[in-house]
Amino acid sequence: MISNDVLLNTFSLLMIFFLLLWGGCFFIFTYKELDGPKLGKESFLYFNFIFFKRGILSNISLLTLFCGYLSAALVEYRREFNYLMLIVNMMGGIAFLLYGIYGKCFFHGVSEINKPLFFIRVFIAEVDFSFGSLLLWLSRLMYMTWIVMFVINS
């Protein structure tokens, strides 16, 4: 279906642009950092790379994930005009960003970046009460709120 809504089309193009850029970063990561595909582990290792590695490629990947998610939230808002879902989807995007900032700047544990699902284990099991872990706790709270509200409104 073709839409005449200029903002919807603009946000859709932005979303496609950011997702293509994010996919390009994944391609570069797979062939530059991993030296080729690793039989299904590269997507998990890519998220470890995004959330815990410091560098230009990982920062660009995190920002394109965040911007792509926010533009997708704006596309959904322009389709349904539901303010609650806009706020909840924005919280989900901010949760990704806060977790990335925590992992890059404030995570002080042993970084097992080459193990798949490391980013999930840190998100679920890391218990820390330092100032930097405030970002982790806010990310958890926003992510859980996002899941609950997404399930309620579906």
PLM features: residue spans?
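Final/C-terminal transmembrane alpha-helix of multipass membrane proteins
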Residues: 128-154
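Short membrane-interface loop/juxtamembrane segments of multi-pass integral membrane proteins
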Residues: 40-52, 114-132
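Juxtamembrane "helix-exit" motif on the non-cytosolic side of transmembrane helices
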Residues: 33, 68-80, 150-154
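N-terminal signal-anchor/start-transfer transmembrane helix
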Residues: 9-37
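Alpha-helical transmembrane segments of polytopic membrane proteins
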Residues: 10-17, 54-56, 84-95
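Short, strongly hydrophobic alpha-helical membrane anchors
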Residues: 1-8
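Short alpha-helical packing/oligomerization segments
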Residues: 76-113
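Interfacial helix-start motif at the membrane-water boundary
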Residues: 47-64
